Amino acid sequence: MMTFYRTTRLMLSSAAVLSFASSAFALDGNDLLKKINDIYGQQGATIAAQGVDIDGSTVTLKGASFKAAGMDDSIPLGDITLDGVEEKDGGYTIEEIDFADVDFNKDGAAVSATDLKLNGVEIPADATKGDLGSLLYYKSAHAGAVSVTKDDVEVFSIEGADATMNKRDDKSGLDFDAKINGIKADLSKVDDAKAKEAIEALKLQQIDGTVAMKGSWEIGPGTIDISEYSFDFKDIGKLNLAFSISGYTPAFAKSMQEALKTVRSNPNQQEAQQSAGLAMLGLLQQLTFNSAKIRFDDASITGRALDFAGKQQGVSGKQLADTLKAMTPIMMAQLNVPELQNAVSTAVNAYLDNPKSLTVTAAPGKPVPVPMIIGAAMGAPQSIPQVIGLKVSSND
């Protein structure tokens, strides 16, 4: 009997210890939600949940909703499931976040989205430190099909989208890329007569293309280098934007967020906007311009645009192109930069004769402080091409 008693007491004691240990190491769902909102709160946004359920390492935000700054109503998100949640150094790591499918109606349009998820998510313990570890990070993001329907007709859709981020091993920065595939828009149902005429003349009733981005962020000097930000649409063309600036450090981003937060909290919006403008001018002192490039590769839209614009003026597309070629050097002469005038005239002439590509490049010999560019634009606009090393070329 004594043996049974001792055994029972040992079992109960062990159960109590295990129960205490379990509660001590259980995830705190409310703390997790708070830390998520610490991040979004910097942009004036919040994520709310009607309840937080925990099952092992899985946290479910029940009846979640999102509200951004300036929004009157929240966007319902449904249940958000966070799998593989672990507390780490006061913050959290999450293997995968799955969002409920989106399906709602707004202003007569039905919007749906499926297969929304994030992988390899890191929630910082302190979002105010101003370093790489204080940022919301995810290794990959994915969205499945997205559709917008109006009057039972699909007017816009996306086949899918993917994005990745990669922290450098030396913690010096991030590399990232994103792509939206199968973007389709139906413009054939546009009601406005003039817009409909232009859409039909340009053959833009059905738009089909992709959007892609690739770049990096070096934390120390705050260098953001976007090597690709492209819009590539069938039978239209591909527009690619690339640029590089320095000075956009986490501290700069934090200062900008605080300035915007001050604007949002000030009931006198006119006064707030003026204060924000002054604050932004001060922040711009920290930025430098490294380079930029805009390139358009034509896929037949230029010819249709010339024909349509020429028709509006009672001339052919060829005649309009000849007029533009004649006007270009006259317009460029106002800048009083002969070298640029000749380069632009040559590029425009070649492009209008045989539309293939048009490229505008800004590559100064050394990085230029952004305030210097603003000052030149205000005081001596004609000096801008020399300040930023502006060049124009075509069909190269």
Name every feature range the model reports, one short phrase each:
Residues 1-26:
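Gram-negative bacterial Sec-dependent N-terminal signal peptides
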Residues 20, 27-396:
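Glycine-rich, small/hydroxylated-residue low-complexity segments
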